[in-house]
Amino acid sequence: MAITVEDRFAITELIAMHGHLCDSGELDRLGEVFTTDVTYDVPDFGQKIVGVTALAEAGRALGERNPVGHHVTNVVLSEQADGHVHARSKGIGIYANGTSGSVTYEDTVVRVENGWRISHRKTLARRAPLGG
């Protein structure tokens, strides 16, 4: 079954919601974005987090080192043979000291009882131009 325009809108909004929840400190609501057993893989920062509760705890542990703004852009969605959706997007993090960083998010998005959720996210730091 092809993903619909409504699905595309819902998934894009889901991806955007992550930044809003993090920036407002509403980490207990991350279950609205991720499955309870999400794998959040951040190899460039040396860790893999499993579970939405552990993800919220990791965010709290970062404390003041968290960005003040998570900005997601350039969302591209493609349906997979198993009905899941692969979502690729760019993230820009703005820190309190005015510096910024760029990442690529590679997400597996699955349909669950209450809508779409991210079941796997790989976050890759972008530190060199032209894919280097």
Residue ranges and their predicted role:
Residues 27-91:
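A solvent-exposed, acidic/Ser-Thr-rich amphipathic alpha-helical stretch
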Residues 2-3, 15, 40, 62, ...:
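Residue-level detector of alpha-helix boundaries and kinks
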Residues 1-24, 28, 32, 36:
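Short, low-complexity N-terminal intrinsically disordered segments enriched in polar/charged residues
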Residues 5, 46-49, 96:
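Charge-dense, low-complexity intrinsically disordered segments
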Residues 62-132:
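A beta-strand edge to alpha-helix "cap/lid" segment located at domain peripheries
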Residues 26-29, 41, 119, 123-126:
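Poly-acidic low-complexity segments
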